[in-house]
């Protein structure tokens, strides 16, 4: 029998003794997520990110994060079937400033609307806003029974479906093309576009449950900090005064470490 130490056992023992358990959360920081000024509740919650270490900067890890929030939480409302996507575009101090990134209906709402004995009409269109955002809007609507109808089914003819789809596309294009992103979001919150489509299509075939069911962000213009600050109600006292219709101006929340954008001309 060879006399000597068992190298494998001693080596393994040393390795195990050296290893230290480090809590990963000790290297992370919490940041507040702020919604744009279009919504009633600005503070969405908190997000976690690893602290700045060497070339890895914390704010770079936060930019581009997408948060899906129910409209009920944003507006302090009970109607909770709309979900808004918000994307972090800039970090000011401990605040993540977000912008609109998309909208969707919840699955249970979509499933509750689809029923037998009616026609489902869908349309989609790609439209550019006045400030250069390219959006794809999807619309859905359902035929309904007339007041004096005896027949069980309420199916629309193919020609009527085509007319309604054309009307949907026209109204969506008109409403988005003539407005900037902020005004479009203000129309999506109460879904005034869906109500306009419902009214316009009454003469072709009566509809109900007409909604802009989805909005996708296809292209964005070049990022400008000044425009993002305006969305968050921080574009200066002049713009705030115009919005409120008051000469004194409105009090706005400033993010920690906020610096006003440099103006090209005075």
Swiss-Prot record:
One GO term under biological process is:
ribosomal small subunit biogenesis
Is Nucleus one of the keywords? yes
Q: Which GO terms describe its molecular function?
A: structural constituent of ribosome
The principal location of this protein is cytoplasm
User: What is a single cellular component term in the Gene Ontology annotation?
Assistant: cytosolic small ribosomal subunit
Q: Where is this region: Disordered?
A: 236-266
Q: Where in the cell is it found?
A: Cytoplasm; Nucleus; Nucleus, Nucleolus
* SMART domains registered for this protein in UniProt: Ribosomal_S3Ae
* The protein's role, per its UniProt record: Component of the small ribosomal subunit. The ribosome is a large ribonucleoprotein complex responsible for the synthesis of proteins in the cell. Part of the small subunit (SSU) processome, first precursor of the small eukaryotic ribosomal subunit. During the assembly of the SSU processome in the nucleolus, many ribosome biogenesis factors, an RNA chaperone and ribosomal proteins associate with the nascent pre-rRNA and work in concert to generate RNA folding, modifications, rearrangements and cleavage as well as targeted degradation of pre-ribosomal RNA by the RNA exosome.
Q: What protein am I looking at?
A: Small ribosomal subunit protein eS1
Native source species:
Tetraodon nigroviridis
């Amino acid at each position: 029998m060879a006399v000597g130490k068992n190298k494998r056992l001693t080596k393994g023992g040393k390795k195990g003794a050296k290893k230290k358990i480090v809590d990963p959360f000790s290297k992370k920081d919490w940041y507040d997520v702020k919604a744009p000024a279009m919504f009633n509740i600005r503070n969405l919650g908190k997000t976690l990110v690893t602290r700045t270490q060497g070339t890895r900067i914390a704010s770079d890890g936060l930019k581009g994060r997408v948060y899906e929030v129910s409209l009920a939480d944003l507006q302090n409302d009970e109607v909770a079937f709309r979900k808004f996507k918000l994307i972090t575009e800039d970090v000011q101090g401990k605040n993540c400033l977000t912008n609109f990134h998309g909208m969707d209906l919840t699955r249970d709402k979509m499933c509750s609307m689809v029923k037998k004995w009616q026609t489902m009409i869908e349309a989609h269109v790609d439209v550019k806003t006045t400030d250069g955002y390219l959006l794809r809007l999807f619309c859905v609507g359902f035929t309904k029974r007339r007041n004096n109808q005896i027949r069980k089914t309420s199916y629309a003819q193919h020609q009527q479906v085509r007319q309604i789809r054309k009307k949907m596309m026209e109204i969506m294009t008109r409403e988005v093309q003539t407005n900037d992103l902020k005004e479009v979001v203000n129309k999506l919150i109460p879904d005034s576009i869906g109500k306009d489509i419902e009214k316009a299509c009454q003469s072709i075939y009566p509809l109900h449950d007409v909604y802009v069911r989805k909005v996708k962000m296809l292209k964005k213009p070049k990022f400008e900090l000044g425009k993002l600050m305006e969305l968050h109600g921080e574009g200066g006292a002049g713009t705030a005064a115009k919005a409120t219709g008051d000469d004194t101006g409105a009090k706005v929340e400033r993010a920690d470490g906020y610096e006003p954008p440099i103006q090209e001309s005075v």
